[in-house]
């Protein structure tokens, strides 16, 4: 019996309060809101390169990591630390971003009109 990849095991759980799937990172401000929400609650994981239905699409380039880094450094106050791991799953790259619950909360991030708001992650 083939052992399940750790990322496939996470995907099998489906999205919930501590797990979010992102097809791609195209908006650093939007990702900053997700980083802040995880940091302000119980922490969590972002799986970049995974569609909402759980299908693995893979990340397209190194730029995805740099957009997450920019989101944290430029658009979260105080900055939300994160750890990122690249995984190869069935020939596709998935970027796992772990955000711990923060001792420095509340963290804020800009809304769609650039007002910095305190956000939380709910189920």
Regions found by a protein language model. Name each.
Residues 1-123:
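Conserved N-terminal catalytic/coupling substructures associated with nucleotide/phosphate chemistry
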């Amino acid at each position: 019996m083939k052992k399940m990849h750790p990322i496939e095991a996470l995907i099998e759980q489906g999205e919930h309060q501590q797990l979010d799937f992102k097809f791609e990172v195209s908006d650093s401000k939007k990702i900053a809101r997700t980083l802040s929400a995880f940091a302000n609650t119980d922490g969590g994981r972002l799986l970049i390169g995974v569609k909402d239905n759980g299908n693995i699409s893979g990340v397209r380039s190194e730029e995805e990591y740099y957009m997450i880094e920019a989101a944290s450094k430029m658009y979260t106050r105080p900055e939300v630390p994160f750890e990122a791991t690249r995984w190869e799953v069935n020939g596709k790259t998935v970027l796992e971003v772990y955000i711990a619950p923060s001792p420095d909360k509340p963290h804020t991030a800009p809304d769609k009109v650039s007002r910095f708001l305190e956000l939380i992650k709910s189920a």
